[in-house]
């Protein structure tokens, strides 16, 4: 998986233009990944009606089907990404999950749609770990929080694209929405393969060339890193909370506040696209300043933002008023994007260069287990169980308890800060500033 034509020699300098070009390309790849993942939650209502499915079945399609292969393939693919050509892996993964997204549009029953969603999971498992590892070899450690915050803008842009599928569904049907998202990704995979170069690993870390690390080595190292453990757990609980709520928000707006799908998706697309991007860009600027002072300010910042965002998330799913719900979602959803960049940066700085892709894969393993397996299935099952008592309001009552989980995630990031100095030292990044 090595191509000399599109790989950087160890002595070849990486220009500023090349650095930012690769970052923007990878950001768009990430956006397509999130869009192809998020589109299912937007299209829950028409798919449920067309295929005559329960909330439990929809929860399975939304999360579990995607996660079955995402979480199982993620770790071995990340281990491969720490050894093989990352550019080639990203291009192949993008082409695979885009093709499977398009196939969702021609599925005729639950089982065909299930297989297609599993295929999306296999493809996406090979996307984020090599991408974040690649970014870390294009940007020096003092610029990684900034670069990975830019990369994280792909999450808000992808969620906006996925939410906008409601308009396509209203105009041409839910099948067309999948095709409109899947086909362009196949084309863009070729762009990645032809224009992105593979840099030398660890060339910007001012450290000796990294020794290849096995998955077992990474797991052993993680077990000795309290700061890394709290980051992994905090990220998992955060995704359980934020994305667990957001998977079901389009259906919640349709059922409890009687919005049509296009209007609900349109409102949410603005929250994700405009609000989320604004918060990510603001976070990028904040990270650039925090990294120059005390490294503990990064996890402290994440803990504070999550704790603050938890309050409007509770109100949004409990409020009887559509206006109040929309207002609270405008606070909760944009703020939920703030942890993306800082979390990726913490992971990259708390492990040696030889373990970066595997560290991200560990985070994705547990995070996706939480937000793709546990959250959608638990909420769907709870909604079905509560339907006899609450009717159309059963989904609201299933979501309210989940909204409180944000406080738990904030606590783990706060604990990460307490152990950060020792964690940076063990990872070989002791030069990062931690005030006494």
Question: Model-flagged regions — what are they?
Answer:
Residues 9-15, 200-232, 256:
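Juxtamembrane intracellular "pre-TM" segments in multi-pass secondary transporters
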Residues 72-111:
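Conserved MFS/SLC helix-loop-helix module at the cytosolic interface between two early adjacent transmembrane helices
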